[in-house]
């Protein structure tokens, strides 16, 4: 079973949903040109919110826009949606000032049901983690506003999105254990 992003609800669904994401959409004006996908083994993948990354499709998996994929992360793997393939990816990488000399992580596979299960479990605990993180920040008198939490697709790592007027010394904050 293949999955893709269902943008009516913002969730993921089986491939074949007809709704399109207009937000942060990269229009692939070369999509209908034969051989476009073979020109580059790089793909652009979007994660929660506006976070995007570039990955090498070294296994030559047939990918198209909207496919949900498992990609390499440190540690483990993450789940994201393919937003661009083919010749335009290197141009987007250049536009985003992506350092091509750095080691580029790779696409592992199209997401499997077990990947989606772990992803949904991780996504389900994001709100509770955000609330707990806000409580901890308040208890530590950290002048910051935590706006969102994003767990990696396998649940091994979390990204905390916050705003602050000044630099936040978060060393004591990072050593605390949040709910899992």
Residue ranges and their predicted role:
Residues 168-173:
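Short, intrinsically disordered, charge-balanced linker/junction segments flanking boundaries
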Residues 174-180:
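Conserved small/polar residues in nucleotide/adenosyl-binding loops
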Residues 1-90:
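N-terminal, positively charged regions that mediate nucleic acid binding
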Residues 145-154:
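Short edge beta-strands and adjacent turn/loop segments
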């Amino acid at each position: 079973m293949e999955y893709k992003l269902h943008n009516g609800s913002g969730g993921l669904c089986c491939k074949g949903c007809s709704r399109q994401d207009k937000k942060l959409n990269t229009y692939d004006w070369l999509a209908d040109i034969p051989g476009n996908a073979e020109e580059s083994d790089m793909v652009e993948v979007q994660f929660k919110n506006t976070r995007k990354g570039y990955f090498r499709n070294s296994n030559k998996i047939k990918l198209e826009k909207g496919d949900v994929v498992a990609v390499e992360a440190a540690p483990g793997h993450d789940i994201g949606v393919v937003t661009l393939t083919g010749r335009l990816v290197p141009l987007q990488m250049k536009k985003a000032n992506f350092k091509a000399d750095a080691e580029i992580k790779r696409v592992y596979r199209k997401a499997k049901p077990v990947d989606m299960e772990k992803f949904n479990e991780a996504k389900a605990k994001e709100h509770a983690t955000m609330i707990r993180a806000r409580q901890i920040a308040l208890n530590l008198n950290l002048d910051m506003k935590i706006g969102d939490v994003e767990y990696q697709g396998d649940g091994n790592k979390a990204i905390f999105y916050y705003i602050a007027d000044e630099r936040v010394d978060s060393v004591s904050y990072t050593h605390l254990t949040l709910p899992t």
